[in-house]
Amino acid sequence: MSLTINSNIAATRASKYLASNHQNLQKSLDRLSSGRRITEPADDAGGLAVSMKLENEINQLEGAANNIANAISFLQVQDGILENISNIVMRLGELKSMSDDVLQDGSTIYDSEVADLSTQLDTYTTATNNTFNGVNLLDSTSNLTVTAGSQSITISRHDIATALTSGDNNSDDFTNLTLVGNITSADDVNEILEQVAELRATNGGEANQLQYAMADVSTQITNLTAAKGRIMDVDIAAESANLARQQILVQASAAMVAQANAANNVALTLLQ
């Protein structure tokens, strides 16, 4: 092998390996510091494309989960109102029973409370009096539709005014009572309670449907997140071993560059 000054092939090759090893070391540091296997498209273009699609699906499902959570809260508030209505109607029935006591000297002592309770019931029939984030809780004109992933779920906004009437042709209106005597019989109370109970049953069924939808969406989010992680996340143990290897290679190649440069000093010795 000839000895030259202008060309140092050994040093050139060692420098090339040093640059390559240093680049690999930098890549390993990037992966460990970010926790990602893919830090730029060149690492795995196909994997990056798949992970972006998965992330988009996850984001959409998380939005659906928020929609479902809000719908569940809506139903919980709605049921609270229906429960209050049930309690008021039961109290009216109690007042009716007490007014029928033959030992009572008249029923007028209950009239004031009956009128007050009836007025409270009447407030529930006005949709704008009962809202959740600006949305009417009780509105017979329309229902709501919640998008839960791939399915749509209907949320009922009940006709509470009709539920608070009983008797033939809905002649007994519990939102317009002024006297305990306006309550025809205990059967009227029972009829209205049954009607309100049906509304609460519908509310509960819709809430259960939303809970199942939430569980389904949560499962999808978990599975998609795991799939994305398998593509994007770095194996810390394996990458740590690779980092140690690259550090040794960088040190070794740097030492070889120095050795290759020193080898040409022999030519100077010959020229002396």
Describe every region a protein language model picked out.
Residues 24-25:
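N-terminal glycine-rich anion-binding loops that anchor highly charged ligand groups
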Residues 235, 248, 252:
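Short alpha-helical H-box segment flanking the phosphoacceptor histidine in two-component systems
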Residues 2-12, 19, 33, 37-41, ...:
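Amphipathic alpha-helical coiled-coil/heptad-repeat segments
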Residues 240-244:
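A short, polar/charged loop-to-alpha-helix boundary motif
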